[in-house]
């Protein structure tokens, strides 16, 4: 475990308090790896855990619980084969292809159409791209909006569909210590049951899409895949992360409308429902939300999704 | 001289996480070392313009994530590579054992036309650590592995102390340029991907 390879962001990971901060990170990540052996430890998890140290500056238990909750949302990102990351990259390409064909076409022409350059943004929920002070505003706003969209549509947020795997793998583990048992139980409670056949609200993909669209001119001026990779690795910090999530939500709804029109107003396997968008516009009652998930795969989808969409609703 | 075309050489650095890939790249290109590199997620690259044996070369050095789980995505950047640098930590036997996997994976993913003669290079890094007392892989063992894989050049390096870094990358450049020349001699009309593809297609049709 390379907990020490975390950036010097945040008060608890700087100067004299850094060694203690890194010790805490290591404890929490070790406890998590014990709880969830399928994921174990993976690089990038330190980036996700570090902000939690500051939210709970003294309480490891609370920080651990919060980290389990966070991992519940992004756990699939770290599973072997990176199938879910491929799915998200594919969805990102589909979203930009639908909402900004010129930009998407440009990226495809210069060889960046796989969107692998956005891998870090997606994996770490833009943790390295936004200012340290903005990380939690971004994440909490994103989670709240995702929950609202999910409630409105009757569909699960991105976290769903993973409980079974955790339960299965945990049975093969050696007996847990009382404290671990308690942590494990609390973790299990955070895991919603898998929802077979449903699709998810992947707002984070739309947040990344919004961030990329915010840098549209710069991306259009990139003449090669290499330039895009360098640009993405030194991505300009978004100045207003709440506005970024607002934009993501608008993109989400617009993408849904376009998908619905394209599919003639019917999408099999999706649920019906109405909702109000963030700017208070009442949406049509006929499955406006369901259509927005047209790019998302069913929860039980198998790995090996192609980078350009990959499901029955994928762009041709 | 000034009319000579500048060649672009794409170099891919591979190896387990924490062996010092990012540090080697930064020491070579930017002449600096810090212990504070974040774990590489995805991939990044740096370029350096050099002149070797009277040839102007732009080195494009790709640094990829070392954790095995990320390997399948890192390979998106292997295409078109002119050489591949395999790095291990001399104080970490597993990182040496994993060289086989990294080499095989690179050959599968990058698909060089002549894998047996593709220019690889092995760097045993962190030779400075604890004054050499924590070493787990001897120079002899590393050289034997390199010899068994078709005489891959081997350098012992320290990105931290800047030992052998420049020499290793200069050697890499020479080997890649030599390979390029041999390829040209071998198939004078098929130096770019499109020509090769057309030829292959033609061969398939007839």
From Swiss-Prot, chain B:
One of its GO terms (biological process) is protein transport. It is found in: Cell membrane. The keyword GTP-binding applies. GTP binds at residues 15-22, 63-67, 125-128. A motif (Effector region) lies at residues 37-45. It is a lipid-anchor. A lipid is attached at residues 205-206 (S-geranylgeranyl cysteine). Belongs to the small GTPase superfamily. Rab family. This is GTP-binding protein YPTC5. It comes from Chlamydomonas reinhardtii (Chlamydomonas smithii).
């Amino acid at each position: 475990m390379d907990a020490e390879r975390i950036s010097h962001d945040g008060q608890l990971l700087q100067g004299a308090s850094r060694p203690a901060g890194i010790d805490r990170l290591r404890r929490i990540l070790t406890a998590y790896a014990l709880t969830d052996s399928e994921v174990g430890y993976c690089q990038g998890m330190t980036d996700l855990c570090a902000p939690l140290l500051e939210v709970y500056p003294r309480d490891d238990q609370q920080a651990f619980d919060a980290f389990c909750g966070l991992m519940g949302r992004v756990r699939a990102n770290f599973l072997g084969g990176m199938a879910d990351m491929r799915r998200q990259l594919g969805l990102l390409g589909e979203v930009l292809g639908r909402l900004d064909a010129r930009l998407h076409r440009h990226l495809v022409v210069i060889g960046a159409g796989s969107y692998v350059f956005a891998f870090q943004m997606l994996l770490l929920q833009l943790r390295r791209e936004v200012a340290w002070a903005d990380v939690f505003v971004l994440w909490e706003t994103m989670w709240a909006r995702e929950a609202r969209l999910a409630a409105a549509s009757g569909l699960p947020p991105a976290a769903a569909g993973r409980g079974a795997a955790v339960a299965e793998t945990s049975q093969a583990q050696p007996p847990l210590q009382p404290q671990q048992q308690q942590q494990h139980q609390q973790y299990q409670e955070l895991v919603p049951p898998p929802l077979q056949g449903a699709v998810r609200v992947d707002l984070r993909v739309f947040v990344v899409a919004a961030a990329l669209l915010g840098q549209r001119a710069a991306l259009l001026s990139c003449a090669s895949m290499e330039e895009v990779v360098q640009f993405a690795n030194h991505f300009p910090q978004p100045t207003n992360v709440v506005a970024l999530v607002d934009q993501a939500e608008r993109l989400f709804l617009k993408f849904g409308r376009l998908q619905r029109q394209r599919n003639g107003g019917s999408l099999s396997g999706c649920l019906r429902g109405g909702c109000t968008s963030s700017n208070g516009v009442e949406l049509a009652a006929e499955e406006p939300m369901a259509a927005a998930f047209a790019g998302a795969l069913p929860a039980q989808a198998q790995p090996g999704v192609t980078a350009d969409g990959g499901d029955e609703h994928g762009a041709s | 001289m000034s009319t000579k075309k500048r060649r672009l050489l794409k170099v891919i650095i591979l190896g387990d996480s924490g062996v010092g890939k990012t540090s080697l790249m930064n020491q070579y290109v930017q002449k600096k070392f810090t212990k504070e590199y974040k774990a590489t997620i995805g991939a990044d690259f740096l370029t350096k313009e050099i002149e070797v044996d009277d040839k102007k070369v732009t080195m494009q050095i790709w640094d990829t994530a070392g954790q095995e789980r990320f390997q399948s995505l890192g390979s998106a950047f292997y295409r078109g590579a002119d050489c591949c640098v395999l790095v291990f930590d001399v104080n970490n036997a597993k990182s040496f054992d994993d060289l086989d996997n990294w080499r095989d994976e690179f050959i599968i993913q990058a698909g060089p036309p002549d894998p047996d003669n593709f220019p690889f290079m092995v760097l045993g890094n962190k030779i400075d650590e604890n004054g050499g007392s924590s070493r787990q892989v001897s120079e002899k063992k590393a050289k034997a592995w390199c010899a068994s894989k078709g005489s891959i050049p081997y350098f012992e390096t320290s990105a931290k102390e800047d030992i052998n870094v420049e020499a290793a990358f200069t050697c890499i450049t020479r080997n890649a340029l030599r390979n390029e020349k041999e390829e040209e001699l071998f198939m004078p009309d098929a130096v770019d991907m499109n020509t090769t593809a057309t030829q292959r297609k033609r061969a398939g049709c007839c």
